Amino acid sequence: MKKGINRVVLVGTGAVGCSYAYSMINQGVAEEFVLVDVNEAKAEGEAMDLSHAVPFSPSPTKVWSGSYADCKDADLVVITAGLPQKPGETRLDLVEKNTKIFKQIVRGIMDSGFDGIFLIATNPVDILTYVTWKESGLPKERVIGSGTTLDSARFRYMLGDYLDVDPRNVHAYIVGEHGDTELPVWSHATIGVQKLETILANNEQYKQEDLDKIFENVRDAAYHIIERKGATYYGIGMSLLRVTKAILNNENSVLTVSAYLEGQYGEKDAYVGVPAVINREGVREIVELELNEEEKAKFAHSVKVLKETMAPVL
């Protein structure tokens, strides 16, 4: 890594990758930004287009299309490459196809001498983050998945809309698989400093069945969006930007990334969406919430499904 210069390499210039790339340039997050894609002409075109936006950015960024060799001096490699989720297809349906793709990508990156942090977004993200960790040989702290950062953002937005509160003042987490078995941590949800359960108890207009419907809409959001426009990319692009800023700026921010469990939440040897403190070293620590019995059971089920799905492809 070059001292004093933040280099981020993006592998995959599809809709998700380009949404992330645009947000990176828009906010001037890194000094160097490299785009890599199997379709070299596409990566080159995107780099050209993005570079023309740099004069409008808050700080200058050198943008170019490159290769895995550019990962050698990278602080962060973000992977969005892979086959997208089709209408009616679950994230876990993608596991076999994208695992093969990922193993090749990670090997190519590591051959460059890369020694930074991986941030994974390709689905099924928890499984592919685990695959990246295994293939790379890097410490677990330096391999991170986008996890349930987007799910938690959707959750906060919808709760804020329901309660007529700025979603930035809604503190609520979605944990577990980024997918069908994820779960809301109702027991720790707060609006400002007030517990959501207290607000419910003191206001007749707010009902638990409405909250349950909100969670269903959060869990199924990708399906609804894919049915209408074919893919999701703006939300995940901003989620990746948020994690990137936490890493490069050494923020020690708590984000629900896919992190490796070693006994936390009663689970081991799995990458799962949980609150974690993120800084320049990657995952500084996992924040272990005290779940109620129902939440514990649902979390254990989510991890079990991930492990069962992952086993045949490792």
Swiss-Prot record:
It catalyses: (S)-lactate + NAD(+) = pyruvate + NADH + H(+). NAD(+) binds at residues 16, 37, 42, 68, 82-83, 121-123, 146. GO terms for cellular component: cytoplasm. One of its GO terms (molecular function) is L-lactate dehydrogenase activity. The modification Phosphotyrosine is found at residue 223. Homotetramer. This is L-lactate dehydrogenase 2. It comes from Bacillus anthracis.
